[in-house]
Regions:
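N-terminal beta-strand motif that seeds the catalytic metal site of vicinal oxygen chelate
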Residues: 1-19, 37, 77-82
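Vicinal oxygen chelate
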Residues: 13-16, 77-111
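Short glycine/proline- and charge-enriched loop/turn segments
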Residues: 71-75
Length: 111
């Protein structure tokens, strides 16, 4: 079997804020939340590239599906890389991400 990544799922505490961050702040394509009619079913799929999606799934629902108890969230649970070719490009990506966080959360701690 040749491994192939098709869906990368991230457990989130607030699905709507996460949707706003990725869609409105970072400009990633999505149709929004689906499966909201089902208990533990709401999810957001974001198109990353051909055949690869990012799924935002409430942490409690993800734990429910896995048959485990939900754990407290932490900043070191997961990271996603975004490769760039220069420091100015990295700075621009970071500024866009910070602006998206401010828009989604309303505040951002100073550095």
């Amino acid at each position: 079997m040749k491994p192939r990544l098709s869906v990368l799922t991230i457990g989130v505490d607030d699905l709507e804020k996460s949707l706003r961050f990725y869609r409105d702040g970072l400009g990633l394509a999505t149709i929004g939340s689906v499966g909201t009619e089902f208990e533990h079913g709401a999810v957001v799929f974001i198109d990353l590239q051909a055949g690869v999606k990012l799924a935002l799934y409430p942490r409690r629902s993800l734990a429910h599906d896995a048959g485990i108890a939900a754990q407290p969230s932490g900043a070191t649970e997961f990271s996603i890389g975004h490769n760039v070719s220069s420091k100015p490009e990295a700075d621009a990506v970071m500024e866009q991400a910070k602006a998206a966080l401010r828009q989604a959360l309303g505040t951002l701690r100073p550095e």
